[in-house]
C-alpha cells in the first residue's frame, strides 16, 4: 500500500475541518504544501525540524519551530504555543530514541479522536547504528508491539473485578485507556486516540 493510500485511510475524516496538524520533519517543505491542499483552508499546520533552513516555509497558516524532537523542554514550549493537535506525524530523525521519546510525550497532548502516525519505521530494522541509539536497544516497532499488549491490558487482571469498576478506577495502563487502535503498515504505524470504555462480552 502506498503512503498516500495510508494517509487517506487515516486522515480523510479530518478534511475541510478546523484541525491542527503537528508534523515532525519538514525537510524541503513538500509535505506542508501537500497537507494544505489535502485538508483545505481551515487547517493549521505546525512543523518541527532541527534545521534552521526550514523556517523559510512559514506562511499564514504554517508555523515552523526549530529544535530537537527528543528534547522534552523544546516540545513543551511548542505545545504551549499552539492549539492541541488533532494529527501528529513523525517523519523526523527516525532514530529509535527520537521516535519513542516524541511518542511518549506528545501522545498525551493529542486530541481525543486524533491520530498519531509514525513514518519510515523500517529504520527499526536498519543496520546503521545511528537509528539504534537507546541503551535498552528498543526499536519503535518493538515498542509498538509492546503497546499492542498494553491495548489489551484489561485482560491481564481479574476480568470480573474490571467489570464492576468505573473505567477511571480500573487498574490498567494509560495506553489501555487511551489507545483505541494500532494499525501496522509497511513502514508506517498509526495510533488512534480515544477514551476507551471497559470491554464486555455478550453471551448468546
Where are these regions (language model features)?
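A short alpha-helical cap/connector motif
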Residues: 1-89, 93-118, 122-204
